[in-house]
């Protein structure tokens, strides 16, 4: 996890990397002492590029390039804490939030007398490529994406196990690592294309 610690418009800790887990984070970049002032903290994952604010009334940004291949997409998290004074116990808690949209799919049976096999699921018309996220808004929340990339021509193909068994009439294709991780956006031109087949009494019907 990368971090930025700012005194107004100047960075006190610039791009310092921390490693560890909840309650146990450490850096090999040296020892830092709290200055006699309020601080702002910005945290972000290592898969992004950080840009410092241009002025004292601006916020930093991170840029990210969303891979077209879902298996290469990452879960991007950030944290922001403003106007912090030195804690009496020397402990600072940062609450991270997910800033991409996680998408999984499940299919509900229309007629239980049929056998359904979903062969492919593709999302088209959703913008990808490069985007910039600006910190700000309510502490611990907020921030905005500016998506400058376009939607990939072939869309995003959802990878799943189509041999799963229906439970209570629903095929749930969610697995540990098969989520689509896309930018939050208005999907006015987006489509979900599902290719599937149904079987009954040795007869097969293919639909899209």
Question: Residues of each region from the PLM?
Answer:
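Short, low-hydrophobicity acidic/polar segments
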Residues: 3, 8-125, 160-176, 181-200, ...
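Acidic/polar low-complexity flexible segments
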Residues: 113-161
């Amino acid at each position: 996890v990368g971090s930025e610690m700012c005194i107004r418009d100047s960075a006190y800790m610039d791009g310092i990397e921390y490693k560890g887990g909840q309650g146990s984070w450490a850096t090999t970049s040296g020892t830092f002492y709290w200055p006699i002032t309020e601080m702002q903290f910005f945290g972000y994952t290592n898969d992004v590029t950080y840009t410092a604010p241009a002025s004292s009334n601006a916020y930093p940004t991170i840029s990210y390039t969303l891979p077209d291949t879902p298996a290469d997409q990452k879960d991007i998290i950030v944290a922001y804490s403003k106007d912090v004074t030195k804690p009496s116990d020397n402990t600072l808690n940062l609450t991270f939030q997910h800033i991409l949209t996680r998408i999984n799919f499940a299919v509900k049976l229309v007629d239980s007398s049929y056998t359904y096999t979903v062969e492919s699921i593709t999302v088209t018309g959703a913008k990808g490529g490069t985007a910039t996220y600006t910190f700000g808004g309510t502490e611990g929340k907020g921030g905005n994406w500016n998506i400058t990339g376009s939607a990939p021509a072939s869309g995003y193909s959802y990878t799943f196990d189509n041999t799963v068994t229906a439970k209570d009439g629903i095929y749930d294709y969610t697995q540990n690592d098969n989520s689509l991780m896309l930018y939050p956006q208005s999907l006015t031109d987006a489509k979900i294309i599902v290719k599937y087949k149904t079987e009954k009494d040795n007869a097969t019907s293919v639909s899209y």
